[in-house]
Regions:
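Append "and occasionally in soluble cytosolic enzymes with long acidic Gly/Pro-rich linkers
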Residues: 1-107, 111, 198, 251-272
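Extracytoplasmic/peripheral linker and loop segments enriched in polar/acidic and small residues
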Residues: 1-3, 31-37, 41-44, 115-130, ...
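Structural recognition of the beta-strand scaffold that forms the well-ordered cores
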Residues: 87-90, 121-122, 140-144, 210-211
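Extracytoplasmic/secreted cell-surface and envelope-processing proteins
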Residues: 97-100, 130-133, 150-155, 221-223
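Short helices/loops that flank or line small-molecule/ion binding pockets
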Residues: 103-111, 127-140
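Ligand-binding clamshell of periplasmic/extracellular solute-binding protein-like
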Residues: 139-155, 171, 215
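Long beta-strand-rich cores associated with HINT superfamily self-processing modules
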Residues: 221-272
Length: 272
């Protein structure tokens, strides 16, 4: 089911649990974000219209903006007239799959908001380095892929502070920084997760970061028997104890293994 790769949170569901078996993404206010359906074209248009009413003159001139040439070289230069529609530059590689993803995003944004208010332009780089675009901040939308080596929210969230390595938006978030500091100094693991959940929700609610996908691999095949590997596949022991299947697993067999795992997990948590 492709829906399984959609995600609203920075840290993945079913990857981090507290001592009582509670999923980190079930800590509020992160839980509400995880369970929200953000696909709402009508609301997107309403927000854009509200922004236009506040930031534009009656003739569509954007307040504080003048006609000029925007230098995004080596991506290109763009002439702007300081009026609606707002131009958004999406910069990506010339990889076929990435171009398709950019085209899909362009279609979704323009269909939801309307080309009368937004102009989504795609620029693909080839023959020049990533650093010539990313380092001088020559982008409006930055697509990034994050991974972590251990089952703790700090693996991702400490890299997204005001001075963090993954702060590609160059934002200043002292409130977020303070929550991260509280997380790292928490007295218990549960308290640590609570502060991290509040920090992660802060980034998501403020749209500093917009998570939307958990993996680009889609469907995949494996010889590993489900529920015999460690729950989170990190480190050099991630396959310790894993059973290897010689024959394909049917759906009914998978559901049987899943039911047995759920029972065993519930019983194990009672002993904690």
């Amino acid at each position: 089911n492709p829906a399984r790769i959609l995600r609203n949170t920075i840290n993945a569901e079913d990857a981090i649990f507290d001592g009582n078996g509670v999923d980190y993404t079930d800590y509020e206010p992160l839980k509400a974000i995880k369970e929200t359906n953000y696909s709402n074209p009508e609301l997107a248009r309403q927000y854009m219209e509200a922004a236009v009413a506040e930031l534009c003159e009656a003739d569509g001139t954007i307040k504080g903006i003048e006609a000029c040439t925007v230098d995004y070289l080596p991506v290109g230069t763009f002439e702007v007239d300081g009026k609606l529609p707002v131009t958004v530059i999406y910069v990506g590689t010339d990889d076929e799959s990435e171009i398709i993803m950019a085209q899909l995003m362009k279609a979704m944004v323009e269909e939801a908001i309307g080309t009368d208010l937004i102009n989504f332009e795609i620029a693909a780089f080839s023959g020049w380095t990533y650093g010539t675009v990313a380092d001088p901040l020559n982008y409006d939308i930055y697509f990034d892929s994050l991974s972590t080596g251990y089952a703790d929210p700090s693996g991702l969230l400490t890299r997204m502070t005001t001075d963090g390595a993954e702060n590609v938006g160059c934002y200043e978030v002292p409130e977020y920084d303070a929550l991260i500091e509280k997380s790292l100094n928490a007295a218990t693991f549960e308290e640590r997760l609570q502060y991290f959940a509040e920090a992660e929700a802060y980034l998501c609610n403020g749209a500093y970061v917009i998570p939307f996908i958990s993996s680009l691999r889609g469907y995949y095949m494996t010889n590993s028997m489900p529920f015999t590997s460690p729950l989170t596949l990190y480190g050099n022991s991630k396959y310790k104890g894993t059973l290897v299947m010689e024959e394909p697993l049917t759906y009914d067999e998978y559901k049987t293994l899943e039911a047995a795992y759920d029972i065993a997990r519930t019983e194990a948590l009672k002993e904690i």
